From Swiss-Prot:
Chief localisation class: nucleus
Zinc finger CCHC-type: from-to: 186-209
Record flagged with keyword Metal-binding: yes
Extent of motif Nuclear localization signal: 146-153
Protein's name in the database: Protein indeterminate-domain 12
Protein's organism: Arabidopsis thaliana
Described purpose of this protein according to its UniProt entry: Probable transcription factor.
Segments for region (Disordered): 47-66
Binding site for Zn(2+) 1: 161, 164, 177, 181
Keyword Transcription: yes
Length: 402
């Protein structure tokens, strides 16, 4: 019994909450709709206040009963149809001549029109057959108007403004322009002047777009310069001029038969001058030293780039006869004295591959003074005694081969 009462109480409370929530939702919906209605009404009011301007009707809508007159270009542009006998000034219409005669105190008379002639109007068509005003339905009702139209659209522009170099076909247009030229100019940031605001706005939009595009291209190019491709950063080895001068006195050589694996060691970040000298001499020892290596030193030796010896994985070289160096083998960067102790490093590359010290005199003189002697001069038996003394004096022992 108690449970049924509690259940009914819960159901009633839930229905009350649901009705309250639905009422709140309805109220919020009404408020949102009223706000949306206000927005729509404000937008409609704004559009009503800014209605587009009504376009001007096309010129030339004559009376159907008007008289259509077609004049030739020569007659239309004639300025001396009616000439004053006093000053020889020409006029296109007789009435203008009669009015001009009053200034000379001459008798003048205007042509009187009756009532019927006044009621009938005259319209003029353009002599140009391709023009829209050539059709009678688009004829112009004024002789001066058709004359200016023909000059502006189909005539020669012979009136020039001295300030802005603009040309005009009608003198009245030229005079009106000269009065305001330079007083109402619109200047763009690029330096161009405009006398009309609409042309200035059109040009300004195009000029701004062009400036943004050029700025974007400039920023892209500058970012590429400041952040180069990281793949090429590890292949460039930098060293100072003092260390590079250490290798200019004695040239280094490398042959085409060298294995690229021997030169594929990763470059170090920075080396001192002593380390560079040791590395260069070790490379020289592998190139020139050793009794079992086949070498040939001629007059057509070519220098290789020291920078590429020190870490660049591309070796540029040329040789007078590459077949002479086919048997060259690179064993390493350093060689040891081939004695029993093997504790002393040979940085000058004076040892060979055997157990004895094997030095060629030409190598010693090359390292000492940078003077290259032809090997053929030391291959004969006549020079054995002269260089044997030099070896004994230096303290080298063992069998050597001349």
């Amino acid at each position: 019994m108690f449970s049924s009462h509690s259940l009914s109480y819960k159901l009633s409370s839930l229905s009350t909450e649901a009705s309250a929530s639905s009422g709140n939702n309805t109220l919020s919906t009404i408020q949102e709709f009223s706000g949306f209605h206000n927005v729509i009404s404000s937008v409609c009011t704004h559009t009503e206040t800014h209605k587009p301007k009504k376009k001007r009707g096309l010129p030339g809508n004559p009376d159907p009963d008007a008289e259509v007159i077609a004049l030739s270009p020569k007659t239309l542009l004639a300025t001396n149809r009616f000439v004053c006998e006093i000053c020889n000034k020409g006029f296109q219409r007789d009435q203008n001549l009669q009015l001009h005669r009053r200034g000379h105190n001459l008798p003048w008379k205007l042509k009187q029109k009756n009532t019927k002639e006044q009621q009938k109007k005259k319209v003029y068509v353009c002599p140009e057959t391709n023009c829209a005003h050539h059709h009678p339905s688009r004829a112009l009702g004024d002789l001066t108007g058709i004359k200016k139209h023909f000059c502006r659209k189909h005539g020669e522009k012979k009136w020039k403004c001295e300030k802005c170099s603009k040309f005009y076909a009608v003198q009245s247009d030229w005079k009106a322009h000269t009065k305001i030229c330079g007083t109402r100019d619109y200047r763009c940031d690029c330096g161009t002047l405009f006398s009309r605001k609409d042309t200035f706005i059109t040009h300004r939009a195009f000029c701004d777009a062009l400036a943004e595009e050029s700025a974007r291209l400039h920023s892209t190019s500058s970012s590429n310069l400041t952040n180069p491709n990281p793949n090429f950063q590890g292949h460039h080895f930098m060293f100072n001029k003092s260390s590079s001068l250490l290798f200019t006195s004695s040239p280094l050589f490398i042959e085409p038969s060298l294995s690229t694996a021997a030169l594929s060691t990763p470059p170090t970040a920075a080396l001192s001058a002593t380390a560079l000298l040791q590395k260069a001499t070790s490379l020289s020892s592998t190139t020139f030293g050793g009794g079992g290596q086949t070498r040939s030193i001629g007059h057509h030796r070519h220098l290789t780039n020291v920078n590429e010896f020190l870490g660049v994985d591309r070796v540029m070289m040329t040789s007078a006869s590459s077949s002479e160096y086919d048997q060259l083998v690179v064993d390493g960067f350093t060689s040891t004295w081939q004695k029993a102790d093997r504790l002393t490093r040979d940085f000058l590359g004076l040892t060979g591959h055997g157990g004895h010290v094997s030095v060629r005199p030409g190598d010693m003189l090359e390292y000492a003074g940078g003077v290259a002697f032809p090997m053929s001069a030391y291959d004969t038996e006549s020079h054995d005694h002269s260089f044997q003394k030099a070896y004994d004096h230096l303290g080298f022992s063992g069998a050597h081969r001349m």
